[in-house]
Amino acid sequence: MHFLLHCWLAILIFCSLDYYFLQETLQHYPENVINPIFLSSDLIVKLKNQVWDNGNAIFQPTSFQISNISSGTGAKNVVPGHLDMLFNFRFSTESTESSLRKEFESIVDSLDFDYEIEWNLSGLPYLTTENTLKDIVVNSIKKEAGIDADKNAKGGTSDGRFIAKMKTEIIELGPLNKTIHQIDECVSIADLELLKNIYLDVLKELN
């Protein structure tokens, strides 16, 4: 069993982007067509190649991902008049919500699109600098599992971002996530039993 111990976490910005071009146009009149799907390809290439930051010793570089793109009415012979894009940033402490928004909008503006953006910040990156809880957890993992924990800032968004506002030490330790968000997501019963023993030892050491 391989343990990943999350002592830090990068948080996501979720966002939707709507492009507005002309009204829907019949493809029979190509001279009147402005296709938002074609035009958005330039933006997608720019966003894919953009380096938002280089990360640091703890955090990976900020990553940008597009999760959904939709356009059109479903008609086979009508060019759509707008395009919707859903995307997110998983950002490190090297960037801020403000800097990413400014940089993103600058890229969109450079392509002369009419657009609307709706931003949604799920939380801010946090960093655990104290070692009391971390050392206890690492020692408990060594005692119960016989392995050295891999301490890193990888992983998804968690409720730890809310507790971090209390300026307390945050450690994330849970089951393996090889099947996370997949069909038939599952964990090993043996892993859960081992995890229970680790939690119990941590509680004893904290008492």
What are these regions, as identified by a protein language model?
Residues 3-7, 11, 17-207:
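Metal-dependent amide/peptide-bond hydrolase catalytic core
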